[in-house]
A protein has these predicted regions:
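Active-site-proximal region of nucleotide-activated glycan assembly enzymes
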Residues: 3, 31, 105-170
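Conserved nucleotide-sugar phosphate-binding/catalytic loop shared by glycosyltransferases and other
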Residues: 3-9, 26-69, 154-160
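Residue-level detector of alpha-helix initiation sites
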Residues: 11-12, 16, 94-96, 118-119
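Short amphipathic alpha-helix
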Residues: 14-25, 41
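Hydrophobic/aromatic ligand-binding patch that stacks against planar heteroaromatic rings
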Residues: 24, 45, 103-104, 126-127
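An aromatic- and histidine-rich active-site surface loop
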Residues: 40-44, 88-107
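An amphipathic, basic-hydrophobic alpha-helix
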Residues: 61-88, 98, 106
Length: 173
């Protein structure tokens, strides 16, 4: 069975697209593991959807303490990926992806990125050059990407939760 690690967290704008994609992959019998922070909403949202979740003790890079936590998280991520042996890693942006993507690079695990915003966030900007593919919501995102990397980008739009596709005639009135 194939295994994919999803890295997401912080806000619903990162978490819900990841859950939507993970649900579709689970339907194809792909084993999914989520890695996020142990401090934010993903620690509750992801397990509610019956996905395995591992939280890292990580903070945005704003202080010496957060840099130390980031370094420790890189080593923890290497340990997790070594144990789990995923076929792929998918990052959804945000500081949360940094230690796990570094671990994926160290362990030579292919990784993919998904960008929900028109302008790429710092983490995706830093890691897109070595990514296998980058899935973006908006074509305008390509304007900020060097020509030689554009073939890696695929405009997919933002993944939506299944509820957005189902009609409820009472709610439509």
């Amino acid at each position: 069975m194939k295994k994919v690690v999803f890295i997401t967290g912080g806000t619903g704008g990162h978490i819900y697209p990841a859950i939507s994609i993970a649900k579709k992959m689970r339907e194809q019998n792909i084993d999914i593991l989520f890695i996020g922070t142990e401090h934010r909403m993903e620690k509750e949202l992801v397990p509610k959807e019956n996905f395995r979740f591992i939280g890292l003790d990580i903070l945005p890079l704003k202080s010496i303490k957060s840099v130390i936590k980031m370094i420790i998280s890189v080593f923890k991520a290497i340990s997790i990926l070594n144990k789990e042996k995923p076929d792929k890693v998918i990052g959804f942006g945000n500081y949360i992806t940094i230690p796990v993507l570094i671990a994926a690079i160290v362990l030579r695990i292919p990784y993919y990125l998904q960008e929900q915003n028109c302008t790429m966030g710092m983490a995706n900007k830093y890691f897109y050059k070595k990514a296998k593919k980058i899935f973006i919501a908006f074509e305008d995102t390509l304007e900020l990407v060097k020509e030689k990397y554009r073939s890696k980008f695929i405009v997919t739009g933002n993944p939506l939760r299944e509820e957005f596709y189902t009609k409820n005639s009472k709610e439509e009135r």
